């Protein structure tokens, strides 16, 4: 068993609670040892909604086990009396799975209406966050969806929006605005903000829209098999994907309109999608052709995250900003084949599929790209390497759960992505100018008067002060790095910090090739000329 340190995916409970916490009249009872209610603090801190998470813990205690008792029936009774939800989801923990308790039987002894209880007996050792969330939502839809008459006007369901989703509420608002401009109403958004009654109304919509590959596809496939509902899948990340998403949606809506003898929907003028109703809906097409952005065509980018945002971001960087993609990966092995098929022709090397952050950190250190798009973990790794990084996928920090409007999808999302790419790559110049012309009292670097030596970006070993008067002081290096003289270190400091580690590494490799054992100022100049710096 690996240490649960810096994992990309949460536990099965995390996925279950993302669904139940999204809904209005659903409550989760987690049968687990005391202390596993940490999940409520996670939602309270990150979600930034006025509602308290709908989750209770049925505590498993050693003394109860010794007496052959269980607190689950009593907990279910208390939840029923206090909250009176339409549905209670009972979830096992690793501890109860090891004990092999029969949660179905224990739930029946609670006296609560069995129709109100769903024992989601997922294996917490094998199933993680995304699979658990997708499975539970699909099960709730299967339980609830009932045959319905289609709405008179064109309508859609938006499936897959869940609590703690990446920029969830802003993306939802962005899609709402697009649909309103098209003249399409929203029948149900689920699971976010939906009730069990709302789930029963799902079949009355004309089309099911599923932006996220990880969440909602199982429910959409069930609704297609059971009720013949068409599916529009894919995330509209970027200007061209958004236009294609709109065209595909209109095509599906108009097919149904023809069958019903209703008027067809036309594509509105693009200005109608803009905030002011007068200008272009996105500034990305012209911004990408400015002299400032054209310099990005030579920049190298690496992308890592969940399936949806990895695919969307690679295509956005390559197709709309013209950046060079040096590699991409995902931590969701279940969706790796889909990612490979979507990114065919975009990647110069095989897709990286791993849930070990150390492997991704090593990849970034080896490649030293000009931009990394990843999760909060890549942000930590890049901070140590002085590599620009923007977060584009869960897991995230609290700053990615914003109160303000900050979409990733749609035309407005394309503008925000372009801004984030630009500022992530460019803001480092300010620090470089301060380093180059003087810090004016701002301590961005360590004390430059200290005699030190960096090795592959790490701090130098403590050394004795060198003999005064020597023109070039050589200090021993740590690890695999080569010794650098003081004058070479001073020359290196004039290199922008965000490529400094890369220059150090390339210089040392060059020195080894020509048989040098110490990096002096002369060796540094030769390396610069040879490597085109």
UniProtKB/Swiss-Prot annotation:
UniProt keyword terms in alphabetical order: 4Fe-4S, ATP-binding, Bacteriochlorophyll biosynthesis, Chlorophyll biosynthesis, Iron, Iron-sulfur, Metal-binding, Nucleotide-binding, Oxidoreductase, Photosynthesis
Co-factor: note: Binds 1 [4Fe-4S] cluster per heterodimer. The cluster is bound at the heterodimer interface by residues from both subunits.
Family from the record: Belongs to the ChlB/BchB/BchZ family.
Gene: bchB
Pathways per UniProt: Porphyrin-containing compound metabolism; bacteriochlorophyll biosynthesis (light-independent)
Substrates-to-products reaction catalysed: chlorophyllide a + oxidized 2[4Fe-4S]-[ferredoxin] + 2 ADP + 2 phosphate = protochlorophyllide a + reduced 2[4Fe-4S]-[ferredoxin] + 2 ATP + 2 H2O
UniProt cross-references to Pfam families, sorted A to Z: Oxidored_nitro, PCP_red
UniProt-annotated binding residues for substrate: 428-429
Catalytic activity, EC: 1.3.7.7
UniProt-listed PANTHER family: LIGHT-INDEPENDENT PROTOCHLOROPHYLLIDE REDUCTASE SUBUNIT B
Protein name in the entry: Light-independent protochlorophyllide reductase subunit B
Any one GO molecular-function label of the UniProt entry: 4 iron, 4 sulfur cluster binding
Cofactors required: [4Fe-4S] cluster
Subunit-structure text: Protochlorophyllide reductase is composed of three subunits; BchL, BchN and BchB. Forms a heterotetramer of two BchB and two BchN subunits.
Lineage: Bacteria, Pseudomonadati, Chlorobiota, Chlorobiia, Chlorobiales
Role: Component of the dark-operative protochlorophyllide reductase (DPOR) that uses Mg-ATP and reduced ferredoxin to reduce ring D of protochlorophyllide (Pchlide) to form chlorophyllide a (Chlide). This reaction is light-independent. The NB-protein (BchN-BchB) is the catalytic component of the complex.
Positions of [4Fe-4S] cluster binding: 36
Residues of the active site: 292 (proton donor)
Organism: Prosthecochloris aestuarii (strain DSM 271 / SK 413)
GO BP term, pick one: photosynthesis, dark reaction
EC top class named in words: oxidoreductase
Domain of life: Bacteria
């Amino acid at each position: 068993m690996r240490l649960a340190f810096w994992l990309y995916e949460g536990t099965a409970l995390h996925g279950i609670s993302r669904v139940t916490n999204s809904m209005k009249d659903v409550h989760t009872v987690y049968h687990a040892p005391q202390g596993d209610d940490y999940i409520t603090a996670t939602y309270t801190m990150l979600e930034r909604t006025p509602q308290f998470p709908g989750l209770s813990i049925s505590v498993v205690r050693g003394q109860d086990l010794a007496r052959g008792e269980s607190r689950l029936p009593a907990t279910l009774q208390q939840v029923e009396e206090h909250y009176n939800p339409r549905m209670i989801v009972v979830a096992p923990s690793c501890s109860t799975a090891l004990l092999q308790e029969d949660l179905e039987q224990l739930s029946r002894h609670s006296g609560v209406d069995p129709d109100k209880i769903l024992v989601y007996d997922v294996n917490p050792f094998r199933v993680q966050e995304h699979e658990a969330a997708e499975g539970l939502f699909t099960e709730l839809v299967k339980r609830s969806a009932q045959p319905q008459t289609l709405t008179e006007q064109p309508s859609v369901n938006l499936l897959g929006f869940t609590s703690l989703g990446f920029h969830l509420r802003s993306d939802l608002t962005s899609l709402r605005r697009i649909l309103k401009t098209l003249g399409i109403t929203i029948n149900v958004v689920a699971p976010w903000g939906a009730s069990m009654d709302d789930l029963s109304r799902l079949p009355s919509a004309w089309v099911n829209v599923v932006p996220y590959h990880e969440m909602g596809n199982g429910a959409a496939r069930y609704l297609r098999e059971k009720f013949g509902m068409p599916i529009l899948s894919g995330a509209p990340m970027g200007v061209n994907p958004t236009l294609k998403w709109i065209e595909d949606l209109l095509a599906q809506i108009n097919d149904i309109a023809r069958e019903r003898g209703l008027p067809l929907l036309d594509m509105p003028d693009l200005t109608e999608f803009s905030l002011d109703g007068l200008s272009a809906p996105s500034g990305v097409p012209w911004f990408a052709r400015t002299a400032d952005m054209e310099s990005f065509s030579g920049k190298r980018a690496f992308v890592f995250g969940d399936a949806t945002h990895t695919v969307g971001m690679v295509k956005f960087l390559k197709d709309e900003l013209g950046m060079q993609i040096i590699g991409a990966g995902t931590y969701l092995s279940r969706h790796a084949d889909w990612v490979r098929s979507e990114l065919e022709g975009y990647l110069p090397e095989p897709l990286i599929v791993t849930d070990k952050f150390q492997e991704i950190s090593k990849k970034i250190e080896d490649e030293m790209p000009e931009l990394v798009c990843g999760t909060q973990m890549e942000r930590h790794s890049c901070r140590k390497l002085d590599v620009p990084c923007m977060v584009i996928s869960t897991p995230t920090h609290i700053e990615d759960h914003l109160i303000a409007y900050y979409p990733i999808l749609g035309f407005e999302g394309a503008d925000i992505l372009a801004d984030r790419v630009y500022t992530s790559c460019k803001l480092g110049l300010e620090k470089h100018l301060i380093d180059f012309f003087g810090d004016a009292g701002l301590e961005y670097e360590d004390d430059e008067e200290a005699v030190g030596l960096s090795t592959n970006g790490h701090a130098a070993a403590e050394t004795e002060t060198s003999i005064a008067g020597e023109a070039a002081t050589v200090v021993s290096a740590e690890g695999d790095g080569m010794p650098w003289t003081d004058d070479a270190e001073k020359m290196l400091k004039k290199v922008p910090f965000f490529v400094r580690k890369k220059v150090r590494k390339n210089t040392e490799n060059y020195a080894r090739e020509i048989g040098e054992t110490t990096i002096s100022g002369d060796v540094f100049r030769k390396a610069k000329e040879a490597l085109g710096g």
